[in-house]
Amino acid sequence: MYQKEIEQRRTFGIISHPDAGKTTLTEKLLLFGGAIQLAGTVKARKATRHATSDWMAIEKERGISVTTSVMKFHYRDFEINLLDTPGHQDFSEDTYRVLTAVDSAVMVIDGAKGVEPQTEKLMEICLLRNTPVITFINKLDREVLSPLELLADIEKKLQIECVPMSWPIGMGKSFRGVYNLYRRELQLFTPGASTRGGEVFVIRDLDDPELDRRLGSQADELREDIALMEGAANPFVYEHFLKANQTPVFFGSAINNFGVRELLDAVVELAPSPRPRLATTREVLPSEEQFSGFAFKIQANMDSAHRDRIAFVRICSGKFTRGMKVRHNRIGKDVTLANATIFMAQDRASVEEAYPGDIIGIHNHGTIRIGDTFTEGEELRFTGIPNFAPEHFCRVRLKNPLKTKQLQKGLNQLSEEGIVQVFRPLTSNDYILGVVGVLQFDVTMVRLLNEYGVEADYESVDYAAARWVTCPEREKLENFEKQHRSNLALDSEGNLIYLALSQWRLSNTMEEWPDITMHKTMEHSQRLN
């Protein structure tokens, strides 16, 4: 029974460049999975509904996903956990952390633009982690690049072999649907965002006159394309897909429901069930009986009526049951998980039991941090959940000095969520904020004002790069601190970080101090020295 529950789980994230149609696709997957009845039109600012997965106020205002939503739904005989990731170009750090909690990913490509910069960045992470990727080429209802151009672009830029699983019939105004190369099925859809399905015709033989009747002159084009594909395309090898060496490719139009159902079918048929996870001491198998999991995200104020905080925990092994006692390893305390929840964007429901691959929400009263591990007693720490060295910096100046406590509390919570990193220089009482993408400053500003009543000025500072600093020899580290005190700060964990005024200065310092190690990333909640 327990093994069956594991095999029925599919936990995946959706990654893309901004505006490739990721949020629309997320909604349509939920629609086809029966989780929602009506898809919200994401870009329609005047519409009364907002996209289900973009629920925070700043997201509704700007039409971008800046936090991560977790949505659970049932499809066929499978339990799907879909993680919608920030789509804005500035949110790769938060997106990266989400990719530590998934077993596979769906990559959305805008058919008119091909591979774009954020897609490359996120695919690098998937390839590093050997995360299997299914590709969905979107917006075929518009004028797009040719299918062969798109496949060549993916292979060249992302260094991954493409295997088309479906083939588009026309594009733009002449787009008629998709032909499933593996099922030998022709799928013709009626355009329209409210359509949940479409006509499907089984065409076992491409010479079938039914094809000509349905497609007219496009039937011969389809025959030529498929003959070309079958001669040149690589065969699909499941082991290559699992190692992220090969990606199955589907074509469609999310806004018009073209190709969405077969993409969802591919997720349940091809994407792996929960996989083993690496901890500091050993590999943890999902089939192990003892419960284990890690927090990959902290979200404050999911319910505007209550100042609550939720830790998103990915279950790695064992079975979760409501009211169970677990060990919070970092602080060495046993805690009772009495009110865990599952998510559907902002909607929540109590959960009685959950299995590996599931994402549960645990109420957090300030004790849980990103990267924390929970077990049934074993001393474990799951690895691979890093902080990135920030690339943009600013100084916070309070308009009202009496709000210092609120500022400290707000920054503390936002840094634990991974929204912003907070540094305290060794030579002043300033608060220096560091982010990977500048939009995070806007999010920090809006949330400090709305949630903590903090009005502040945000001044740019001259730092160009940051690196965490370690050295096994105490004396050398102390000498380094003396000479570079004005460029050193402490992060929220008390780790020493070097703030460089330029890339040249950073390189120069690294050359002058070969015994000092400069780290571009570090594990969450880790004390370095």
From Swiss-Prot:
Pfam families in the cross-refs: EF-G_D2, GTP_EFTU, RF3_C
PROSITE patterns (alphabetical): G_TR_1, G_TR_2
GO biological process: regulation of translational termination
Keyword Transcription: no
Keywords: Cytoplasm, GTP-binding, Nucleotide-binding, Protein biosynthesis
Entry keyword annotation includes Nucleotide-binding: yes
InterPro entries: EF-G-like_DII, EFG_III/V, G_TR_CS, P-loop_NTPase, PrfC, RF3_C, RF3_dom_3_sf, RF3_GTP-bd
Residues bound to GTP: 16-23, 84-88, 138-141
Subcellular localization, as worded in the UniProt entry: Cytoplasm
GO cellular component: cytosol
Superkingdom as given in the UniProt entry: Bacteria
Domain tr-type G: 7-275
GO MF terms, alphabetically ordered: GTP binding; GTPase activity; translation release factor activity, codon nonspecific; translation release factor activity, codon specific
Stated family: Belongs to the TRAFAC class translation factor GTPase superfamily. Classic translation factor GTPase family. PrfC subfamily.
Function, as annotated: Increases the formation of ribosomal termination complexes and stimulates activities of RF-1 and RF-2. It binds guanine nucleotides and has strong preference for UGA stop codons. It may interact directly with the ribosome. The stimulation of RF-1 and RF-2 is significantly reduced by GTP and GDP, but not by GMP.
HAMAP family named among the record's database cross-references: Rel_fac_3
Protein known as: Peptide chain release factor 3
The species this protein was found in: Syntrophus aciditrophicus (strain SB)
